[in-house]
């Protein structure tokens, strides 16, 4: 069936519609509202987004905080040029970290970030990741101090389709105003549309719940299998506090701010008897594994052949998704992380 054929999720996007910078002020970003029951499309801006939220809906937000995950170093302490890139993914066992390192690398290699701080390669993993440990003058760093190192020397991990180096504005614009728990290496991008004023109004006027899904680097990976049902999606760390779990269990109508919040809710609500607050989320939502527990979604416009485009199709159908994306391109909506948004009701 064509809805499970990977090629059905391809589309052409003119390069000029890839947003390299955010719209400021945030409220001026464009918003496409699709109402499924009436099949109507409304073109507006984020200044009016809360006017469309159903009054009785529970609004779910992902409060993960993006790490400055890109480090640049050199293979020799005395070299001033830092041309080796280390992309931090997540902590592994104890104080080691899973990373990607550009260029040739072998076990035992050291990458220096300054005269004192360096990383040592411990293992080359089959999936292209490298297991490393961080040191300060030969003293191993714990997780807390590694995060301090990343904050001091790291760069914001802008997505690969943004063809520029990170700038000072990215430190706050590629971070939601309600970001709280550090651990993501990509922003939950629908969240970026909310200013502090808009957030305060949302929290005052709507029932809401926070959860934390630490978005992983796998979020940018294309699906590669010809039949999308055979794709193995990446795993991400999910934390849902008991208070939020209780609110989710009792709520009938749910609106998620972003696909990460939606995937988290769907994963949690399908568990038989959840008795913990932390999980490993690996749910892949598509037309053969449709959305069951979320009614509405605020999201950005996603990459061709991505699992997120398949998630949107699982919510409104493949043909309707393609139709709306075609309209968005014709109307010059801006796509991807710093782009405009879409509200599905």
From Swiss-Prot:
GO cellular component, one term: cytoplasm
EC assignment: 2.4.99.17
Biological process (GO), any one: tRNA wobble guanine modification
Substrates-to-products reaction catalysed: 7-aminomethyl-7-carbaguanosine(34) in tRNA + S-adenosyl-L-methionine = epoxyqueuosine(34) in tRNA + adenine + L-methionine + 2 H(+)
Gene3D superfamilies assigned: QueA-like
Pathway annotation from the record: tRNA modification; tRNA-queuosine biosynthesis
Role played: Transfers and isomerizes the ribose moiety from AdoMet to the 7-aminomethyl group of 7-deazaguanine (preQ1-tRNA) to give epoxyqueuosine (oQ-tRNA).
Family the UniProt entry places it in: Belongs to the QueA family.
PANTHER family: S-ADENOSYLMETHIONINE:TRNA RIBOSYLTRANSFERASE-ISOMERASE
Protein name: S-adenosylmethionine:tRNA ribosyltransferase-isomerase
């Amino acid at each position: 069936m064509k809805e499970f054929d990977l090629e059905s999720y391809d589309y052409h996007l003119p390069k000029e519609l890839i947003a390299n910078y955010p719209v400021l002020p945030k409220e001026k970003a464009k918003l496409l509202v699709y109402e499924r029951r009436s099949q109507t499309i409304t073109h507006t801006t984020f200044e009016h987004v809360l006017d469309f939220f159903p009054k009785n809906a529970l609004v779910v937000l992902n409060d993960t905080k993006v790490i400055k995950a890109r480090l640049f170093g050199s293979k020799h302490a005395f070299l001033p040029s830092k041309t080796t890139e280390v992309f931090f993914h997540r902590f592994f066992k104890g104080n080691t970290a899973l990373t990607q390192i550009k260029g040739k690398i072998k076990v035992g290699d050291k990458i220096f970030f300054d005269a004192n701080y360096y990383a040592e390669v411990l293992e080359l993993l089959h999936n292209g990741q490298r297991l490393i440990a961080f040191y300060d003058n030969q003293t191993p760093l714990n997780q807390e101090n590694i995060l301090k190192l990343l904050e001091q020397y790291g760069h914001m991990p802008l997505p690969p389709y943004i063809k520029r180096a990170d700038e000072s504005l990215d430190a706050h614009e590629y971070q939601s105003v309600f970001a709280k728990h550090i651990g993501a290496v990509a922003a939950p991008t629908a969240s970026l549309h909310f200013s502090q004023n808009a957030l305060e109004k949302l929290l005052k006027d709507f029932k809401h719940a926070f959860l934390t899904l630490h978005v992983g680097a796998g979020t940018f990976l294309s699906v590669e299998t010809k039949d999308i049902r055979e794709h193995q999606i990446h795993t991400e760390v999910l934390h849902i506090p008991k208070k939020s779990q209780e609110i989710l269990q009792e709520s009938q109508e749910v609106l998620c701010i972003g696909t990460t919040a939606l995937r988290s809710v769907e994963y949690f609500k399908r568990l038989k008897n959840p008795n913990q607050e932390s999980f490993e989320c690996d749910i892949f939502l598509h037309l053969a594994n449709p959305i069951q527990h979320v009614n509405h979604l605020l999201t950005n416009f996603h990459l061709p052949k991505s699992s997120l485009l398949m998630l949107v199709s699982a919510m409104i159908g493949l043909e309707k998704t393609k139709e709306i994306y075609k309209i968005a391109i014709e109307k010059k909506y801006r796509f991807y992380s710093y782009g405009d948004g879409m509200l599905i009701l």
